[in-house]
UniProtKB/Swiss-Prot annotation:
ATP binds at G8, I9, P10, G11, V12, G13, K14, T15, T16. Gene3D superfamilies: P-loop containing nucleotide triphosphate hydrolases. It comes from Saccharolobus solfataricus (strain ATCC 35092 / DSM 1617 / JCM 11322 / P2) (Sulfolobus solfataricus). Coiled coil: none annotated. Its EC number is 2.7.4.3. GO terms for molecular function: adenylate kinase activity; ATP binding. Belongs to the archaeal adenylate kinase family. Homotrimer. One of its GO terms (cellular component) is cytoplasm. It is found in: Cytoplasm. Pfam families: AAA_17 (PF13207). Keywords: ATP-binding, Cytoplasm, Kinase, Nucleotide-binding, Transferase. This is Adenylate kinase.
Length: 195
């Protein structure tokens, strides 16, 4: 099985790009599964009573976040292993999480070694476009990312973090630009890099 980790700042369009990737892989008849790392963490955090919503996860104490990361990684690999050798697993997550205590690596050693991806993708877009997308998405609380300078800083930390994680497992790192108006281009680039 080939695993690709698709990272990006909130509002870059990961969920949209991955929905296009799902459609393309289905049309090609390729066995695949797309999972959201945050969903796995959220389900555990809700069960344990740590949070009431997804956006509260990044505000938890660092130790709680690490515990949730490890549990999620193990569960994801269990689920993706059902795809068999020819399957493609795409994981929607973040390379870094901006917390009150500083930047938390989204793919630290205890996570990346379990997931062992072929490629870590950095989905990026112009910070002004990301800010516009965030404003249009009223379903999420992202006030801690509501400035282009902060968005630029997070993008840079994500690049550093992705490369550091890739070194641990021999994965490649690929920047994919999500152009406004056509997420299928980014989706195709991700798929082609895993084939």
């Amino acid at each position: 099985m080939k695993i690709g980790i698709v990272t990006g700042i909130p509002g870059v369009g990961k969920t949209t790009v991955l929905s296009f990737a799902d459609k393309i892989l289905t049309e090609k008849g390729i066995s695949h599964k797309i999972v959201n790392y945050g969903d796995y963490m959220l389900n555990t955090a809700l069960k344990e009573g740590y949070v009431k919503s997804r956006d509260e996860i990044r505000k938890l104490q660092i130790e709680k976040q690490r515990e949730l990361q490890a549990l999620a990684a193990r569960r994801i690999v269990e689920d993706l292993s059902l795809l068999g050798d020819e399957g493609i697993g795409l994981i929607d997550t973040h390379a870094v999480i901006r917390t009150p205590a500083g930047y938390l690596p989204g793919l630290p050693r205890h996570v990346i070694e379990v997931l062992s991806p072929k490629v870590i993708f950095l989905l990026e877009a112009d910070p002004k476009i990301i800010l516009e997308r965030q404003k249009r998405d009223s379903s999420r609380a992202r006030t801690d990312y509501s400035d282009t300078a902060v968005i630029n800083e997070v993008i840079q930390f994500a690049r550093y973090s992705a490369m550091a994680s890739a070194v641990l497992v021999g994965a490649s790192v690929k920047v994919v630009v999500n152009q406004e108006g056509d997420p299928s281009i980014a989706a195709s680039e991700i798929i082609n890099s895993l084939m």
